């Protein structure tokens, strides 16, 4: 059963374009190496601003654990991605979620 890593971030005012560039250029390509699927990526337009949500899909809990460990050790993640985004994030919420069998599955 697919597992979803649902992440909500509050960014510093005006930091959304810079954060999106870091994800596009480094963050997503690193996750791609470990077969992590981008299931959704959104940013606020109306209402509470400076919010981004990304949803990453994994085949199962074992894939989530394995990929999470590999991403954390990846040199591009540690040396290129984290330094770019650390100063942009004000708050973070993360949920690991499951999807029922009637919902679309990424794998």
Feature annotation, model-predicted:
Residues 42-44:
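Short, solvent-exposed loop/turn elements at beta->coil junctions and helix N-caps
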Residues 4-6, 49-53:
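Short, solvent-exposed beta-strand edge segments and adjacent coil->beta transition regions
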Residues 1-20, 26, 30-33, 37, ...:
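Surface-exposed interaction/gating patches
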Residues 10, 55-57:
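Short hydrophobic/aromatic beta-strand micro-patches
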